[in-house]
A protein has these predicted regions:
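Short glycine-/acidic-enriched loop or helix-start segments at secondary-structure transitions
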Residues: 16, 46-47, 73-75, 145-146, ...
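Acidic, His/Gly-enriched loop-helix segments that form or flank divalent-metal centers
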Residues: 95, 100-224
Length: 224
């Protein structure tokens, strides 16, 4: 089996499709498997196209739940957007799914959008594990101490059995910091998304490249 792994598409369907095509992904090849490590929607303008493509062309894709999926569900269940839903692009996703020209109240739009996405949400998992890899969104559940200068340490129990709230927290974690501080899966490589790769190059490689702006390195970061 050959795995094609992407993360944080954020409704940029065109860029996503171009990337997997260039990588050689063939949805008709039974030896090819697509893994998406969360955050399918928000920010870009093509959530509907992305959802239709995954449902129709890649129904066997492995979909891992991200923090933006949590944000989407919580906003839809509230029936109203909060300030962070605008800044994160979640509110706009509702309009992209339901059509900006319809004179519907937001609460009804949210109900319709959630109904559209529910089958995809039901396919999502917290993690996917193979003999050599673990795929997640932020990181595996662990203990986070302090808020600003986060310190991470492993759970005493098996992370695979962590409750729902622990997985929701883990979807926000900086996986590069977690790995550097010893939260690992022995004998396996953890593949994550969520955090910008330029952070790892800037903070851990200390090669003079900035975290953001001109010269930042957004290529995949490989921890030791």
């Amino acid at each position: 089996m050959k795995y094609f792994v992407v993360s944080d598409i954020h409704s940029f369907f065109g860029e996503f499709k171009k990337a997997i095509d260039e990588a050689g992904f063939d949805p008709t090849d039974e030896n090819h498997r697509l893994i998406i490590c969360g955050d399918l929607f928000d920010r870009g303008s093509q959530p509907l196209e992305l959802m239709q493509h995954l449902n129709e062309e890649v129904p066997n894709a492995i979909l891992i739940r991200g923090n933006h999926e949590d944000l989407f569900v919580k906003m839809c269940e509230r029936g109203e957007p909060w300030m962070h839903d605008y800044s994160n692009g979640t509110a706009q996703t509702i309009f992209d799914f339901t059509g900006v020209d319809k004179p519907w109240p937001f609460e009804y739009r949210a109900e319709v959008a959630l109904g559209m996405v529910r089958p995809m949400l039901n396919r999502m998992v917290d993690y996917y594990e193979t003999d050599h890899y673990v795929f997640v969104h932020g990181w595996i559940p662990c203990v986070k101490e302090h808020h600003r200068l986060a310190k991470y340490r492993p759970l005493e129990e098996d992370w695979r059995d962590a409750p729902k709230n622990k997985w929701e927290d883990a979807r926000w974690y900086n996986g590069m910091d977690c790995a550097a501080q010893g939260v690992v899966v022995p004998g396996k490589t953890v593949v994550c998304g969520h955090w910008h790769c330029s952070y790892g190059h800037w903070f851990y490689e200390n090669d003079g490249k900035p975290e953001f702006g001109e010269g930042a390195d957004f290529s995949p970061y490989y921890a030791n």
